[in-house]
Amino acid sequence: MVATHRARRKEIRKRLREFDDVWRKGSDARLWEELAYCIFTAGASARMGLNSVEAVRPLLLNGDSDAMTVALKSAGAHRFPVARPRYIVSTRNYFHSDCGMALRKRLRSFRDPFERRDWLAQEKQVKGLGYKEASHFLRNIGVKGHAILDKHVMRCLAEVGVIDSAKPPSTRRKYLEVEQQLIRFARDIGVDFDELDLVLWSMKTGEVLK
């Protein structure tokens, strides 16, 4: 694992800088695109999420769910071409009413970063997230300190004995518990916590994506 980090460190740090740039330079529309990507990725894959965003990008701000479904089906981009667009539009409607789509300002309104993640994961009108994808979204817009405990990361942690089971955590309490175990593990092996998440993911997928 340390050797993998050493071999991919340059690529991983480049990717993390790209995430930082999304927050420093990106518009609210860009932040919304990243959130939509994470909604598409949930229950699917990172690659499927990327392909889906590419297929519906012109529709993300104003398109309806039916138009998104047509675009996804035409591109063969997603396994849930009807449900995911409904999640996207429903969540977009919520953000319009909650903050006028001013996502940067809304995210900055939280003094506690964990309260911010709790809001994304627990707000019922934010569809299709949960703690993993809320963490994924925050990481992808440059927020540090949140673990993305997907199946790849969980399998790696189980294989090296950090956790007993590779089953993804299903509650907030369990998510925070595993996250703390990952933080301690990163400290023990001398690898930056945010970099380690991408190391583990790349060990199972063979690439450093997002």
Q: Where is each model-derived feature located?
A:
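Alpha-helical ds-nucleic-acid-binding substructure associated with the helix-hairpin-helix region
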Residues: 55-126
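Short, hydrophobic/amphipathic alpha-helical patches that form generic packing surfaces
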Residues: 34-43, 89-93, 139, 198-205
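Structure-specific DNA junction-binding interface
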Residues: 1-78, 84
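Short alpha-helix boundary/capping elements
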Residues: 40-48, 60-61, 96, 145, ...
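A generic structural signal for ordered secondary structure
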Residues: 53, 92, 179-183
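C-terminal accessory module of base-excision DNA glycosylases/AP lyases that mediates lesion recognition
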Residues: 1-22, 85, 100-118, 123-210
